[in-house]
Amino acid sequence: MHKITRIIVFTIVLLTFKTQAQQSVAREWNEQLLEAIRNDFARPTVHARNLFHTSLAMYDAWAVFDPQAETIFLGKNFGGYSCAFNGIATPSDVESARHEVISYAMFRLLSHRFQNSPGSVETLAAFNNHFTSYGYDDTLTSTDYSSGSYAALGNYLASEIIAFGNQDGAHEESGYNNLYYSPQNPPLVLELYEDNTAIDPSRWQPLAFDVFVDQSGNVYPLNTPDFVSPEWGEVVPFSLTSDELEVLNNGFDSYIYHNPSPPPTIQNSNEDGFDDPYKWYFSLVASWSSHLDPNDATMIDISPNGVGNVNFNDFPQTFEEYRSFYDYMEGGDPGTGHSINPYTNMPYTPQMVKRGDYARVLAEFWADGPDSETPPGHWFTIMNYVSDHPLIEKRFNGQGPILSNLEWDIKCYLTLGGAMHDCAVTTWGVKGYYDYIRPISAIRYMAGKGQSSNAALPNYDPHGLPLVPGRIELIESGDPLAGSGDENVGQIKIFAWKGPDFIADPDTDVAHVDWILGTHWWPYQRPTFVTPPFAGYVSGHSTFSRAGAEVLTLLTGDAYFPGGMGTFEAPQNEFLVFEEGPSESLTLQWATYRDASDQCSLSRIWGGIHPPIDDIRGRIIGEEIGVEAYNLALSYFNGTLSTDEFAQIDDIISIYPIPFENEFTVKHHLNEPLKMELYSIDGKIVKSDTILTNNQKVTITSLQKGIYFVRLSNSQNEIVSIKKVIKQ
């Protein structure tokens, strides 16, 4: 009942918008893909790749008939794979030809990619029904487009992408299997609450289940799921470049882009457990677990007036900055909210809700995204939500003419798909190499060791949890947890969500928060899922979401959702899946795309999935990837640069210093003047200049600190580079 309700809830808003305009063929096939993902195994890497490859197919099917745009795959060498293409006659009806090529390409590619899905019967039938509803012939399988057949061109494009996918490093033909990785820790049998103190507390630990059910509701064929995609760094990316790549070895060669540096390992603390970054990060996850109770009277304002508006410059770098950024006891970040909605010029209306409802809804909404499209697919649903909004103007980067629905969707999907794919390649390369532990293992490990705050108190161990009054304490005689024979006296107790043992019927029961044995701590997740089957560092949710936010900001030319706010309704006692709730209806609200991204990041801490160190470094990587993917996509849309040429020009144009105060220098070696335009994050030009010489300084006064974009164009008004700069 809950799952059906959740799909309907999110779709109501979209359906309201959809009735206002006919959807493009690209949008219709994207919706087919998103539904197929919901019925497949929850594999973020695999589906980020599916989203990118299908977006690439649709883009080339569109671009081949555009006089300006440049194809990426047809007739090109992409990622070491050469796709021959001899051209095709210009159609008298371009719109009809594009529709046909896109439909044949998507039908063939999607049918291939989902043939082994657990929902294949339903999914393949849906693909066929959708394809034939256009009047196309599913028996036409020729790839010989030399006669001018647009159906054959679609088939050919799909067959070439399928062939490319069989050698791009994903190991698709053998079921996306791992070749080299093996876990260093034995599985944790969750329900036995066994001693977990013999593990390596820096390495990922598999989880063992009676039955494992993934995020999409599929029963997994193994009761101890393997690490998903630890070697994914080898997969051919979209915009990632060789100068961002390191090949490191931690038992096997790992391909790592945007290396975030190692996460902290546990220290042999000498009565300073709370000052050990490892202990602080993971114990914060346990502390925030205390917020997951609807009986908690704490009320917070979750409107854009009360949350959001975190500046990129505020992201912590040092341990002390982390301790200032995250509120250990009360939850949340230093975001001050937005005083005014820029579209209405009115203050945002406060929305006071129970923190216990907000944290639970947040954890579940972003976990499934919103119903198991996996995180990269979730950002496609947000993109579609934005595209359907009646206030959106489909001007690329907020400028120029209004685009057709098809051109808008094609360009948005390629940019977003490329970014999501690059996030998967980067994040899972990092995960596979650093192989970092998850909170479920780290917290149970430290709780089993004891406490690390005071050697004069019972159960002291340098690897124990820090004692925090009201959150992490020692069990004393007479405590309800002491046991009938005081067998638990001196053990660690945590004030936290009580876990699935206290939920018999998820439609009526709530586990609530209370003191529990530290070795019995659970993330706020379903007992058949608990934690994703791969290492934590860095957070995929944080990386995907920050990249998605950057892409949407750049595509729309506006940091804000249309109308100044995006929303999601969580009805009373109808939204939560594995326990009853929320106790009152609430609406998730985001002023900007970055606010949504930051909220997603916090949700993974409240959900017990990631500590702060996983989060911030993922956000930073995601921001870099989002801008890179946009820049490369833009070069294809403008048709001015091939991939190699773009890389060469981008390499010989640099801007420094970053961050800057009142001036920066543009360095270039192009033999012509460049037009420089400085854009604010909401797409407004704040300065224009002509760069006549190499090492020319640009002076800027009275500019607020924040993120800006420098766009450089040549004398033909062709964009040659877009670079992000930061005003401090």
Predicted region positions:
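Acidic/polar surface patches and capping/hinge elements
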Residues: Q22-G639
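C-terminal outer-membrane/trafficking sorting elements
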Residues: L15-K18, D644-Q728
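Sec-dependent signal peptide recognition
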Residues: H2-F10
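Residue-level signal for alpha-helical transmembrane segments in multi-pass membrane proteins
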Residues: I12-T19, W62
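Short alpha-helical segments used as structural interaction elements across diverse proteins
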Residues: K3, L15, V46, S601, ...
